[in-house]
Amino acid sequence: MKLYYSPGACSLSPHIVAHELGIRLSIEKTDTKTKRTESGRDFWQINPKGYVPALELDNGEVLTEGPAIVQYLADQKGNTQLAPANGTLARARLQEMLNYITSEIHKTYSPLFKDDTPEATREERKAYLTRRYEYIERILAKQQWLLGDHFTVADAYLFTVTRWAAAVKLDLSGYPALLAFQERVAMRPAVQAAMLAEGLIKQKVAA
């Protein structure tokens, strides 16, 4: 399988999950502005939506959308720690959290990365984000991971998008549980391996 990614983008989430599962993916960097892959392919031909991540399966099919990809990867290995079994309430809870991160956090960052976004809109979006992080903070103040006592694909996704806060000057200092969570996730060997492969860190940090 091949993962099309952009360093530090939301594609980092499935990259982390693959490392957590021990799945050996080939990876290909994609320029999200020119829509060209590192090998020169037209990314529009791979994913007509035009954005990462895209997972090219061994049979040539392409799966898109991060939450779908991370669940697919976990299911391939039957890993019910990273993603509970289909049809269970626990799986529905996972999907509930993935949807929250997608719609309420991930997408809210989008206008903050655009140069032409008016300042008033930036401030409104930042205020919206901090309100959404208040919910996450309450969860993480009571437990180590989003869904309880073990790391799931939702944690990989939250970590990935929350890394963007510094780039858009979003102050998260009022969320100590969230910041502690980010540090915990960053120290996981699979996370460091994915970040190293994407050039986000220069070497793994010793535990």
Regions found by a protein language model. Give the residues of each.
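GST-like domain detector, emphasizing the conserved glutathione-binding G-site
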Residues: 1-124, 137
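Positions that flank functional sites
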Residues: 32-33, 151, 180, 200
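Flexible loop residues that form catalytic
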Residues: 60, 161, 199
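Terminal-tail/helix-coil boundary detector
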Residues: 196-207
